[in-house]
Regions:
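C-terminal accessory/tail domains of diverse enzymes
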Residues: 1-166
Length: 169
């Protein structure tokens, strides 16, 4: 291994003439990254009540019946998934995927995750399982309003971004 020097740049480690890219590439935050493990990006714009919801959701999916998950999503078409991904920031739960809105899919996936956490049956000191971490997601689905919907509603009433920022810290 040797150190390469580029004018105006930090020194770069190189091995066999190849510039080391693993560190710079690890700073890119895509929705998921495949390394020696799969790293999933979780929710990063939520309050304390939802910080554990994302990880608990994924744990529930992995400890649940993966065949049920596969059955639910196996007929999804790649181009429709990409289209829903692109439309979701604007349309939220009204985004369509395979003829159903995202609220429909979110509800079904959340139920599968709950079953997985129930199967895992890891209890806290109060003898409650990890499904309690999904309560925030259940409220979002029950209210049919995303965090973005709530922020837009507050802004349309107040139009003070500082006030909205304080409310969501």
């Amino acid at each position: 291994m040797r150190i390469l020097s580029f004018p105006g740049r930090s020194n770069v480690l190189a091995q066999n003439g190849m510039v080391a890219t693993s560190n710079p590439l690890s700073t890119i935050f895509t929705e998921n990254r495949l390394k020696k493990y799969i790293e999933l990006r979780s929710m990063d714009t939520c309050g304390w009540d939802c910080l554990c919801s994302g990880p608990a959701f994924y744990v529930g999916m992995l400890y649940g019946n993966l065949e049920d998950v596969y059955e639910l999503i196996s007929k999804w078409e790649k181009n429709k998934i990409i289209n829903a991904y692109l439309e979701a920031p604007e349309k939220g739960f009204n985004t369509q995927l395979m003829g159903k809105d995202l609220l429909y899919w979110a509800s079904h996936l959340l139920n599968l995750s709950k079953k997985g956490l129930e199967n895992r049956d890891l209890l806290n000191k109060s003898k409650k399982n990890e499904t309690l971490f999904l309560n925030h997601l259940q409220k979002v689905i029950d209210n049919k309003k995303t965090n973005a919907d709530h922020m837009i509603s507050k802004f349309s009433k107040n139009e003070d971004l500082n006030e909205i920022g304080r409310a969501h810290v």
